[in-house]
């Protein structure tokens, strides 16, 4: 059994080193996306950093960072509509009233045509 002494300290050191490198890749990807203005979400960061999405979700600090950046991007993209001035509202109302009057005239014209056709049909019988 003495020959099979386990070197767990080396395994732990290598695991920490791997985790550190992975974090650096993720930080690089997040920084790159922030600078370039690209969409930051779990899929895009996982793809860019070549890590799994489950790893990103598992690391709470990275998860919170991605979620906060994602929320910040969403709120930045929401643009409020400019309020209409009273003048533009008046113009819109006038335009709509004119359109309604045109449609009413057309409707009346079509109703008269229908009555005439009914009259012609009745006279043929």
Curated annotation (Swiss-Prot):
Keywords from the UniProt entry: DNA recombination, DNA-binding, Transposable element, Transposition
Organism, scientific name: Staphylococcus aureus (strain Mu50 / ATCC 700699)
UniProt-listed InterPro entries: TnpC-like
Listed name of the protein: Transposase for transposon Tn554
Summary of the function given for this chain in its UniProt record: One of three proteins encoded by transposon Tn554 required for its transposition.
GO molecular function, one term: DNA binding
UniProt-listed Pfam families: DUF6262
Gene: tnpC1
Source superkingdom: Bacteria
GO biological process, one term: DNA recombination
